[in-house]
């Protein structure tokens, strides 16, 4: 658990302005991407986890909405983020 919280804090420091800046769009997108990547690996082993798959789709939808917001308001930050996280636009 300690490793996980340290990874989250590192992501917040990397994409936010400070370690307390957990609410910014960039940080939320980075954290959602981390969770989505974990769940994608989970579904390789657990193909019939339909409830978890619904949660994954909700996370992808939330990330898409945040990316759309970032694209319309902070385009340079949007381009930096999708390049850094390896996302398509």
Curated annotation (Swiss-Prot):
Keywords: Ribonucleoprotein, Ribosomal protein, RNA-binding, rRNA-binding
Disulfide-bond pairs as recorded: none
Family affiliation: Belongs to the universal ribosomal protein uS15 family.
Organism: Buchnera aphidicola subsp. Cinara cedri (strain Cc)
Gene3D superfamilies from the UniProt entry: 6.10.250.3130, S15/NS1, RNA-binding (1.10.287.10)
Name this polypeptide is given: Small ribosomal subunit protein uS15
Function field: One of the primary rRNA binding proteins, it binds directly to 16S rRNA where it helps nucleate assembly of the platform of the 30S subunit by binding and bridging several RNA helices of the 16S rRNA.
Gene Ontology terms for molecular function: rRNA binding; structural constituent of ribosome
NCBIfam families in alphabetical order: S15_bact
UniProt keyword RNA-binding, yes or no: yes
One record GO biological process: translation
């Amino acid at each position: 658990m300690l490793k996980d919280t340290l990874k989250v804090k590192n992501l917040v420091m990397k994409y936010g302005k400070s370690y307390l800046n957990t609410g910014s769009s960039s940080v939320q997108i980075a954290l959602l991407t981390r969770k989505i990547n974990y769940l994608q690996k989970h579904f390789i082993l657990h193909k019939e986890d339909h409830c978890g798959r619904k949660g994954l789709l909700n996370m992808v939808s939330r990330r898409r909405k945040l990316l759309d917001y970032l694209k319309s308001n902070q385009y340079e930050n949007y381009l930096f983020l999708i390049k850094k996280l390896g996302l398509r636009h």
